[in-house]
């Protein structure tokens, strides 16, 4: 019930983000974006359910803190259909990590699907789309897919047709260098080093070299009830992350409701806190515009944040199923032109926003 009380307080008080935010964020929804080919869909084919049923489901999730089915290790559905994460490459192609028949779907900025796949067998097991969480694209165009409940991350070729590498051991959780426990996020640096948030089970962040050899761990990572913490270098569900132009890492510490900032070598720099519940962070591939975009689950919003000081300069969105609203906003990326893409998981859709004055 704590989530409900926070929501009520925020609504009554106008949310303490107000001194930091301006208007509706200055962004508008691009209608009818993207265009899905015939027979393709996000999430479940016959969903979403009618609005009244969806609102009842949303109320139940808020009442329980939104955590039901979050650690499904049985092979059954996660009850979280739709889009679980987003990534973007150097050509501004948007990669959708889809809890549906095609685990990865790729779109250009015009909303046309240009590639779909990642449904082949890998190391004796096909990727279960119900278990997907997020992924990324490295600087060579290779795609990393997090199959969270299989405790593994698979690296695929740019066309999604060749298996290249795996982090973690398929179907086996653990706390050592060769195992993961419900991993949640990933970023790849220009030199090929890989950063993984091993979040739901281990509360640790891992640094690997390009070959997948573990170099460093930040966090207790013991896999037990005492591995959480609130201090620097400690975590309560490190969730997703992004890098800026200097390759400083902005890592969502979800249940501590903060962002911890590290150097590319995982040296702690600072934290950013606000009245939010951040789930994802998006920074442009160049990372030079000085802003990040936060997917905030508290009131289902996207915030534009200054990287220099963590100040929120604009915000938009609300809880709901209408255009520009969100029901479980779980992923966000930004392209080189400043367009923002948000994954609406239970809404089973991908929404694109552009600056109000923009025409694209």
Regions found by a protein language model. Name each.
Residues 31-75, 118-126, 164-178, 213-233, ...:
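Surface-exposed loop and turn segments in beta-propeller and other repeat-based domains
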Residues 94-99, 145-148, 196-199, 249-254, ...:
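Conserved beta-strand positions in repeat-built beta-propeller and related beta-rich domains
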Residues 108-112, 157-160, 209-213, 263-267, ...:
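Short loop/turn segments that connect beta-strands within beta-propeller blades
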